[in-house]
Amino acid sequence: MDLIIQNLEKEYMKKDIPEIWPGDTVRVHYRIVEGDKERIQVYEGVVIAKKHGGIRETITVRKVVQGVGVERIFPLHSPLVEKIEVVRRGRVRRAKLYYLRERKGKAAKIAEREENEG
């Protein structure tokens, strides 16, 4: 039974998703439908969490707008997600970066990861 579900989910999974890790700064192009109009909104921020796996995989992206922290959860394999770009690689030692919620300014900055680092 589990194999049947995996095969069914596999055909709906996207193949063009880049490798994303917590601490990375990403730009998510998200399709928004308002009435009969459709537009693409670009949301740029730091990945603070990556959850689940397979077709249910989600990322939580955080950004600060006019001094207020805004977080949004994106399902990676959703047809509404047009494209995801990795702007910057961050170097962190945690899988969940929820501690960034309490930090402000320079304390919330994440060091950039060099290409040869794991």
From Swiss-Prot:
GO biological process: translation
Source superkingdom: Bacteria
Classification via InterPro entries: Ribosomal_bL19, Ribosomal_bL19_CS, Ribosomal_bL19_sf, Translation_prot_SH3-like_sf
GO CC list: cytosolic large ribosomal subunit
Record key words, sorted: Ribonucleoprotein, Ribosomal protein
Record has Chaperone as a keyword: no
Gene Ontology MF annotations: structural constituent of ribosome
Alphabetical list of PROSITE patterns matching this protein: RIBOSOMAL_L19 (PS01015)
Annotated Gene3D superfamilies: 2.30.30.790
Primary role: This protein is located at the 30S-50S ribosomal subunit interface and may play a role in the structure and function of the aminoacyl-tRNA binding site.
Sequence similarity: Belongs to the bacterial ribosomal protein bL19 family.
Name of the protein: Large ribosomal subunit protein bL19
Protein's organism: Dictyoglomus thermophilum (strain ATCC 35947 / DSM 3960 / H-6-12)
